[in-house]
Amino acid sequence: STATISAIVAIIGIIFKMFVKKSGFKNVGDIMLGFSILMVGMQTMSGAVAPLKDNEHFVNVLTMFKNPAAGILAGILFTAVLQSASASVGILQALSMSGTITFAAALPITMGIGVGAACPVLLSSIGTNKNGKRTALIYLFNDLFGMLFWSIVFYSVNAVVHFPFMNATMSPVLIAMLNTVFRAATILVLLPFIKWIEKIVYLVVKDS
């Protein structure tokens, strides 16, 4: 089970951290401890949100995120606060255990998470040279342009076609697949425009 695996990983991490002198093993121990704590936290959260499917206020809040603008904004803000896209996706997966996360809510939140993931990159670029700042901006623009492109395309088509899966209930696996497909599709769409994005970045951060 997940709890057993987390416990084993935590024990190994503690051994590496406390009883092995080499710094490399200590770093691995820190990673393993962090991973096990994350897994336990996700499992605890999953169990806690399951009863909330019958809570009217909880359902109303999640329904609000079906609005694309609200969902995207929530994803951006949440990821900016957590400083981790992986943690944000994990929490969304945990919330899906309540059975109240639909595709209509998961999609805009996932789009927002992609943009919010640029926040720690932008923060880390403060104080770096111009190339460091340009790298951070490329990360931001890739996520931002991808979100804008797919928002316009998907919701424009949905306004005409009315996709039947919009109200489908999402599971943790489906959310992981959605996040992966969205990221891959964004990369494929933006590949032909890499040079244009580069030009925009150089206009923002000039050589002079």
Locations of regions flagged by a protein language model:
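Transmembrane helix-bundle signature of multi-pass membrane transporters/permeases
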Residues: L33-S36, I76-L82, A94, L107-A117, ...
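Cytoplasmic-side transmembrane-helix entry/capping segments in multi-pass membrane proteins
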Residues: T2-A7, F25-I37, A136-F141
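Helix-loop-helix hairpins and the membrane-proximal interhelical loops
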Residues: I31-L77, L95
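Transmembrane alpha-helical segments and their short flanking loops
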Residues: M42, V49, K53-M64, I126-S208
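Transmembrane alpha-helical segments of multi-pass small-molecule transport proteins
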Residues: A3-I15, I72-A74
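Membrane-interfacial helix-loop connectors
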Residues: S1-T4, T79-A117, S125-N131, S156-F163, ...
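C-terminal ends of transmembrane helices
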Residues: I12-K26, V121-G127
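Residue-level signal for the membrane-embedded core of alpha-helical transmembrane segments
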Residues: S6-A10, M32, S36-V40, L148, ...
